[in-house]
């Protein structure tokens, strides 16, 4: 994989160089010391992956991510030395299309491979996502769409790259007294999950908190999957975290949650698949449609990364394909019936 480093700190650059060099399949193709330089370098030599710092002179990592994803899109991972202090910037960058976030590996650590392991795992996962070329599954006839009733309601939302900003827009568009439960599955490391819930609560104006083991989704609640395990709905209506299936690249998996909703939810439900790279959520959304639930995929024009919604559209998993700004209104209309 061809990797670029964008960082103004020489020690951080050297630490990242050494970490990347631990895997012979990876090579550093260029280094930029600020975001403006990175934007220019991407027009000259587009890498497979950029390791992007947040705090830099001239142009910071948030604006650089926005510019690169708009002009020469490629995979971006945010690399930071202070996650707590930079949590809001992290979600801004992810809102513009950054895929993930990881700590800067320590230079001179006793076991270099162990220190670099979190970064190398992220690179491996993103390499798999960028390179995957699965053929779309065969289409099947969906069950007739269920009309909303007076039964309890659930909105299951999956998102990845570009998700934080998309979730902010969607949640902002919902009324304060929205009657259904909402469960969010965003590809984010558990270290950042609590910060994301806090950020969404502040930015979107609806209280968002982490989903707890064993609790049922309740009307009016907005719950965010909060660990590196998958979240699923059990037959008794409670939420549970599980390590299985272990072979899922992203944790939490959107497919795992959507599939459990299709299998066990006995009220009204809507599945929503937002911006993101890869195919996670497409098959689960299709299962929800086959059970007669309303399913919605974000359209290409409003997606920061048109991967997951595109995969859903390709297998006819979405009953409706909508611009982001029109999804909240559709949910409100559906549950008002």
Swiss-Prot record:
Domain Response regulatory stretches: 2-119
Primary location group: cytoplasm
InterPro entries linked: CheB-like, CheB_C, CheY-like_superfamily, Sig_transdc_resp-reg_Me-estase, Sig_transdc_resp-reg_receiver
GO CC annotation terms, alphabetical: cytoplasm
Active-site residues, as the UniProt record annotates them: 160, 187, 280
Residue numbers carrying 4-aspartylphosphate: 53
SUPFAM superfamilies, per database record: CheY-like (SSF52172), Methylesterase CheB, C-terminal domain (SSF52738)
PTM field: Phosphorylated by CheA. Phosphorylation of the N-terminal regulatory domain activates the methylesterase activity.
Domain CheB-type methylesterase: from-to ranges: 144-337
Catalytic activity: [protein]-L-glutamate 5-O-methyl ester + H2O = L-glutamyl-[protein] + methanol + H(+); L-glutaminyl-[protein] + H2O = L-glutamyl-[protein] + NH4(+)
A molecular function (GO) term: protein-glutamine glutaminase activity
Keywords (A to Z) from UniProt: Chemotaxis, Cytoplasm, Hydrolase, Phosphoprotein
Family matches, as Gene3D superfamilies: 3.40.50.2300, Methylesterase CheB, C-terminal domain
Enzyme nomenclature, EC number: 3.1.1.61, 3.5.1.44
Pfam families the record matches: CheB_methylest, Response_reg
Any one GO BP annotation for this protein: chemotaxis
Location in the cell: Cytoplasm
Top EC category: hydrolase
UniProt domain comment: Contains a C-terminal catalytic domain, and an N-terminal region which modulates catalytic activity.
UniProt cross-references to NCBIfam families, sorted A to Z: PRK00742.1, PRK12555.1
Family recorded in the similarity comment: Belongs to the CheB family.
Additional observations: P.putida strain KT2440 does not have a chemotaxis group 2 operon.
Function noted in UniProt: Involved in chemotaxis. Part of a chemotaxis signal transduction system that modulates chemotaxis in response to various stimuli. Catalyzes the demethylation of specific methylglutamate residues introduced into the chemoreceptors (methyl-accepting chemotaxis proteins or MCP) by CheR. Also mediates the irreversible deamidation of specific glutamine residues to glutamic acid.
Protein name: Protein-glutamate methylesterase/protein-glutamine glutaminase of group 3 operon
Upper taxonomic lineage: Bacteria, Pseudomonadati, Pseudomonadota, Gammaproteobacteria, Pseudomonadales
Gene field: cheB3
